[in-house]
Amino acid sequence: MSIDTLLYTSLAVGAVYLASVALYELYWSPLAHIPGPKLAACTRLYEFFYDVVCGGQYTFKIADLHKQYGPIIRISPREIHIHDPNYYETLYATNSPRNKDPWFTAHFGVDESAFSTLDYRLHRSRRAMIAPFFAKARMDGAQPLIKANLAKLIRHLDAHASSQSVLKVEVAYNSFTGDVITGYTSYRSFEYLETTDMVPIWSETVRNLVESGMLSRHLPGFFPLLAWAGSRCIAAVYPKLLPVIAFRMKCAQEVNFMWTNSEEGKKEAIQSGCSEPALFPELVSRASSAPDITEERLLHEFITIVAAGTETTAHTMTVCTFHIAHNQSILDKLREELDNRFHSNADMDLQTLEQLPYLTGIIYEGLRLSYGLSHRLQRISPIDPLKYKDIAIPPNTPVGMSSALMHHDESIFPQSHEFIPERWTDPNDRRRLNKYMVSFSKGSRQCIGMNLAFAELYLGIATLFRRYDMKLHDTTLDDVQLHGDKMLPRAKNGSKGVRVTLRRAQSVG
């Protein structure tokens, strides 16, 4: 057989194969009855184009597709997306089994964490080990740690106020939340607030970690190849990966220290003044009687919890900061509420702050416009078929919904792109709207650190805006609005972030 004949035969076989795949997906697949673009039904390249080539634009394309095809659409050969706010609690159910999609979780390199656990039964047991450490009842005990880190943050902000230098708030807030989550779960914080510059690279590390996972699911051999080629190749081809590698190494060192120095951990607990055991030292102490607790498992949990507990809360604080600094009326109402309740910042306590309606409105509106994960979160019903209206969805089909679409549904949140704390201040309105506010997701896989995040937000926003007047510096709404979805929300290309100058407020601080 000649080379030409072999080539033509190969092309013909390839064409027949691709045509067969397309025909199957369009006409015989169990999902063929779901409306949506034909190309998306045939190949993941449709998603690849919008998410990788266009830079995190598939969420916006999905929103357009819903306008064209309706509330349920097929967005890939094996995935469904639904946009119907009233269906959210059905999909993200508390008492129905829900698996995760490996397409979403498998490329972060933390397979043994509760976050990445696919099977609902194994997830239940893994989550049960962790959840008590983040219970609402434990948040009173977290206040001293949060306030201590706020005091460190304030020293940095006072220096900026004195020098009138420009502060990039994402850097400050990520250092604050990073030190809180590491101190809370392991007694040993990363101490970013102890440095002179608050480690600017840290504010991008978690974003790079998540973004690289999103890219690697489309190009599964790309990052292993880079790792094999070495750091010089990584620096030349994808430098965003370097701080991610450094972060994983730092996490591995911390977990190894806890794993091999359990007695030292007890001493640090006493020195830190903690009245209750921290998550990771406590899990280490149980390892001898729990064979499923391994150093590798703890590393995966540590990476996940630190990453999740840093960027999302810091981003919510950043969104709140922009809108408070941008709107004097919001700042005045917040200050009045705080001044009427507290004589000084030292008097503030979490339980009282949670009762303040306007502060609560600011925090909920900040959560709504920061989205948590802006990307869709797929759930799989492993046993029973799901049903959306009269459309049956076969078992083991990934089905996703998106906070970025939920939070901008005008039928639920009129003027959804506006920052309006008043929409949350009435308790009845808050109860009604909270059903549709999904920054922490809902159901059996809801964000485990939600209570700690709320504690940081209440204490952080109240303390900082009672103490400082912040003036935006070369910052616009485009620097906080959602322009790209790379798992985490991204501002416009070229954004320098939210930057402010500060001065001490005239009121009590």
UniProtKB/Swiss-Prot annotation:
User: What induces or represses its expression, per the UniProt entry?
Assistant: Expression is positively regulated by the ochratoxin cluster transcription factor otaR1, probably via its binding to the conserved 5'-ACGT-3' bZIP binding motifs found in multiple copies (3 to 4) in the promoters of the OTA biosynthetic genes. Expression is induced by sucrose, glucose and arabinose which repress the gal4 transcription factor, a negative regulator of the ochratoxin gene cluster.
Which cofactor(s) are needed, names only? Answer: heme
Q: Which GO terms describe its biological process?
A: ochratoxin A biosynthetic process
Q: Which InterPro entries match?
A: Cyt_P450 (IPR001128), Cyt_P450_CS (IPR017972), Cyt_P450_E_grp-I (IPR002401), Cyt_P450_sf (IPR036396), Cytochrome_P450_monoxygenase (IPR050121)
List the pathway annotation: Mycotoxin biosynthesis
Transmembrane domains' residue ranges: 7-29
Q: Where found?
A: Membrane
CDD domains, sorted: CYP58-like (cd11062)
| Residues holding heme | C447
Q: How does it sit in the membrane?
A: Single-pass membrane protein
The UniProt keywords, alphabetically, are: Glycoprotein, Heme, Iron, Membrane, Metal-binding, Monooxygenase, Oxidoreductase, Transmembrane, Transmembrane helix
GO MF terms held by the record: heme binding; iron ion binding; monooxygenase activity; oxidoreductase activity; oxidoreductase activity, acting on paired donors, with incorporation or reduction of molecular oxygen
List glycan-bearing residues: N327, N493
Instruction: Tell me which GO cellular component terms the UniProt record holds.
Output: membrane
Described function: Cytochrome P450 monooxygenase; part of the gene cluster that mediates the biosynthesis of ochratoxin A (OTA), a mycotoxin composed of a chlorinated type I polyketide dihydroisocoumarin moiety linked to L-phenylalanine, and demonstrated to have nephrotoxic, immunotoxic, genotoxic, neurotoxic, and teratogenic properties. OtaC catalyzes the oxidation of 7-methylmellein (7-MM) into 7-carboxymellein.
The entry sums up its family as follows: Belongs to the cytochrome P450 family.
The protein depicted here goes by the name Cytochrome P450 monooxygenase otaC
Species of the source: Aspergillus niger (strain ATCC MYA-4892 / CBS 513.88 / FGSC A1513)
